[in-house]
């Protein structure tokens, strides 16, 4: 089934195209591994990258990669059916991440951070196996802003995410094409196109990341007074004035 090319489609496509152009996310000849979890964000990213691939002046390839972490009830088959029906090149990877997490996790600690690290490592490995020099992740605008606030409020660091960065393996470049796409646009777009959203089935999903939930609630409160607050916070990430910060490493004069 083809995507519904309505106003929402055009807005998201334009935002993704803008991000690719501004941050040089995809170049001629790139082979991009696209992490597809089965959530609304990764489906949206995959379909937008494919839409642009067919229309863009540069040639690039996509390989959809799904990681099954081994949580009971996870329906990887539904994701695979969607990928197959839409003609994507894809790879489904079954792992024992859940068993590793259950063994290594400290009491009362979150599954999320360990799970994310394991998934990321597997994605890097598979990207290399499939000859991909880029790995696309489905973090949207709200994720960037929430991460900025989380680091400020709970870590004491002025840090968010990068739209493009070289991974720790020194080989794969991680890209985030949804940086300009707000979650509120993805939700109806995913619903209207009937993407078969699959829950990760983590036993603590929806309860572990309470700090991020607090940031979401804070932003919702701020938006009621200032509807442009998210746009302003995202703009701040590209409008940095080092002389007005306290990090001596940023203001130290060269010797």
Swiss-Prot record:
Role summary: Catalyzes the ATP-dependent 2-thiolation of cytidine in position 32 of tRNA, to form 2-thiocytidine (s(2)C32). The sulfur atoms are provided by the cysteine/cysteine desulfurase (IscS) system.
Major localization listed first in the record, in broad terms: cytoplasm
Swiss-Prot/TrEMBL catalytic activity: cytidine(32) in tRNA + S-sulfanyl-L-cysteinyl-[cysteine desulfurase] + AH2 + ATP = 2-thiocytidine(32) in tRNA + L-cysteinyl-[cysteine desulfurase] + A + AMP + diphosphate + H(+)
Subcellular location field: Cytoplasm
GO biological process, alphabetically ordered: tRNA modification
InterPro entries the UniProt entry points to: Rossmann-like_a/b/a_fold, TilS/TtcA_N, tRNA_Cyd_32_2_STrfase, tRNA_thiolation_TtcA_Ctu1
More details: The thiolation reaction likely consists of two steps: a first activation step by ATP to form an adenylated intermediate of the target base of tRNA, and a second nucleophilic substitution step of the sulfur (S) atom supplied by the hydrosulfide attached to the Fe-S cluster.
Keyword Phosphoprotein recorded: no
Requisite cofactors: Mg(2+); [4Fe-4S] cluster
Free-text remark on how the cofactor is bound: Binds 1 [4Fe-4S] cluster per subunit. The cluster is chelated by three Cys residues, the fourth Fe has a free coordination site that may bind a sulfur atom transferred from the persulfide of IscS.
Residues that, per the record, bind [4Fe-4S] cluster: 112, 115, 202
Subunit structure: Homodimer.
Name recorded for this polypeptide: tRNA-cytidine(32) 2-sulfurtransferase
Motif (PP-loop motif): 37-42
Gene Ontology molecular-function annotations: 4 iron, 4 sulfur cluster binding; ATP binding; metal ion binding; transferase activity; tRNA binding
SUPFAM superfamilies in the cross-refs: Adenine nucleotide alpha hydrolases-like
Species whose genome carries this gene: Citrifermentans bemidjiense (strain ATCC BAA-1014 / DSM 16622 / JCM 12645 / Bem)
NCBIfam families per the UniProt record, alphabetical: PRK10696.1 (NF007972)
Pathway field: tRNA modification
Coiled coil: none
Record HAMAP family: TtcA (MF_01850)
Keywords of this entry: 4Fe-4S, ATP-binding, Cytoplasm, Iron, Iron-sulfur, Magnesium, Metal-binding, Nucleotide-binding, RNA-binding, Transferase, tRNA processing, tRNA-binding
């Amino acid at each position: 089934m083809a995507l519904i090319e309505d106003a929402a489609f055009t807005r998201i496509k334009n935002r993704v195209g803008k991000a690719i152009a501004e941050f040089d996310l995809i170049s001629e000849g790139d082979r991009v591994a696209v992490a597809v979890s089965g959530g609304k964000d990764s489906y949206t990213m995959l379909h937008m990258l494919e839409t642009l691939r067919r229309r863009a002046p540069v040639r690039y390839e996509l390989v959809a990669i799904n990681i099954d972490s081994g949580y009971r009830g996870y329906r990887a088959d539904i994701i695979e059916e969607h990928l197959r029906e839409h003609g994507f090149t894809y790879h489904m990877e079954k792992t024992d991440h859940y068993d590793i997490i259950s063994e290594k996790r400290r009491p009362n600690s979150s599954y999320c951070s360990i799970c994310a690290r394991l998934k990321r490592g597997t994605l890097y490995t598979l990207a290399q196996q499939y000859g991909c020099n880029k790995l696309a992740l489905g973090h949207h605008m709200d994720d960037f802003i929430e991460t900025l606030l989380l680091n400020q409020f709970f870590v004491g660091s002025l840090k968010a995410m990068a739209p493009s960065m070289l991974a720790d393996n020194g080989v794969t470049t991680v890209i985030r094409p949804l940086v300009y796409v707000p979650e509120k646009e993805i939700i109806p777009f995913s619903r209207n196109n009937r993407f078969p959203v699959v829950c990760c089935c983590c036993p603590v999903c929806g309860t572990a990341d309470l700090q991020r939930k607090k940031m979401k609630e804070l932003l919702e409160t701020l938006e009621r007074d200032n509807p442009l607050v998210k746009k302003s916070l995202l703009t701040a990430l590209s409008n940095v004035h080092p002389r007005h910060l306290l990090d001596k490493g940023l203001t130290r004069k060269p010797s």
